[in-house]
């Protein structure tokens, strides 16, 4: 049976695994489902059609599953889905999706999300990301696996942040950031490959060399995006990492940072 503090309010329809812990004064809504081993701190509010996986640590004053900050929202039963083994620190706010897009805001597994982070409606966050304090995603944004967003990074709506990206503090992201790239500034601009992060994650010397060549084609040779894509195609045929970059560029509807 779940451990629920006497001051917490848990709606009758909420579904809690047997070893879930709910802290003082927290509120758990009617359509919330919480998986095994998840702990919820004090004064947290989990509402809406929200599904939370296993072994998550949700700290004090977090708000999950509230209505999107979108004037078009009219009470539709859209969703928030959170995976397993995430750490969600104090005062984070994650909103449900909207019917104008995918209808769900989705966060993956093993993410480390620091205090005051905002993840807006219809965002998609992959696995093993790090969001430093006060990073914010506007609606419909996407963040790939292993990305690291520096403190106070702001991501414009519909922007995509690729896998293994790292942004500097207070970066303002108006366009898509390709995978493996470091970015910083207002607006964010490319500052080389995330070499140290890629080494720590076990990328081979061959893969790193291929990505360095790809970065040079994309950013150092004065190519247009179309020209860079054409030049990257032969490298992509030989290296999966370059193919991942090329696939991202094909989806970059807002253009990429330059």
UniProtKB/Swiss-Prot annotation:
In terms of Pfam families, this protein maps to: Acetyltransf_11, Hexapep
Q: Where in the cell is it found?
A: Cytoplasm
Q: Does the keyword Acyltransferase apply?
A: yes
Please indicate if the UniProt record lists Membrane as a keyword.
Answer: no
User: Its GO CC terms?
Assistant: cytoplasm; membrane
Main localization category: cytoplasm
Q: Which SUPFAM superfamilies match?
A: Trimeric LpxA-like enzymes (SSF51161)
User: Which reaction does this enzyme catalyse, per its entry?
Assistant: a (3R)-hydroxyacyl-[ACP] + UDP-N-acetyl-alpha-D-glucosamine = a UDP-3-O-[(3R)-3-hydroxyacyl]-N-acetyl-alpha-D-glucosamine + holo-[ACP]
Q: Which UniProt keywords apply?
A: Acyltransferase, Cytoplasm, Lipid A biosynthesis, Lipid biosynthesis, Lipid metabolism, Repeat, Transferase
Looking up InterPro entries in the UniProt record yields:
Acetyltransf_C, Acetyltransf_C_sf, Hexapep, Lipid_A_LpxA, Trimer_LpxA-like_sf
EC code(s) of this entry: 2.3.1.129
- What assembly does the database describe for this protein? Homotrimer.
What is the role of the protein in this entry? Answer: Involved in the biosynthesis of lipid A, a phosphorylated glycolipid that anchors the lipopolysaccharide to the outer membrane of the cell.
Which protein, by its recorded name, is this?
Acyl-[acyl-carrier-protein]--UDP-N-acetylglucosamine O-acyltransferase
């Amino acid at each position: 049976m779940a451990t629920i503090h006497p001051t917490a309010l848990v709606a009758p329809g909420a579904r809690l695994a047997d070893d879930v812990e709910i802290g003082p004064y927290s509120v758990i809504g009617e359509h919330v489902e919480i998986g095994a081993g998840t702990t919820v701190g004090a004064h947290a509010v989990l509402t809406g059609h929200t599904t939370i996986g296993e072994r998550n640590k949700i700290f004090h004053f977090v708000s999950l599953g509230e209505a999107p900050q979108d004037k078009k929202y009219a009470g539709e039963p859209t969703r928030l889905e959170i995976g397993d083994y995430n750490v969600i620190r104090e005062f984070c706010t994650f909103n449900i999706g909207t019917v104008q897009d995918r209808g769900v805001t989705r966060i993956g597994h093993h993410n480390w999300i620091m205090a005051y982070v905002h993840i807006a409606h219809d965002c998609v966050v992959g696995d093993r990301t790090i969001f430093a304090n006060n990073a914010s995603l506007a609606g419909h944004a996407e963040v790939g696996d292993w990305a690291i967003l520096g403190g106070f990074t702001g991501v414009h709506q519909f922007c995509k942040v690729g896998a293994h990206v790292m942004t500097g503090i207070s970066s303002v992201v108006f366009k898509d950031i390709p995978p493996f790239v470091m970015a910083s500034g207002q607006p964010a601009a490319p500052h080389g490959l995330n070499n140290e992060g890629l080494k720590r994650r076990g990328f081979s010397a061959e893969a790193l060399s291929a990505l360095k060549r790809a970065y040079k084609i994309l950013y150092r040779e004065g190519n247009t995006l179309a020209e860079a894509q054409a030049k990257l195609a032969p490298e992509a045929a030989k290296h999966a990492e370059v193919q991942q970059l090329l696939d991202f560029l094909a989806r970059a509807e807002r253009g990429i940072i330059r």
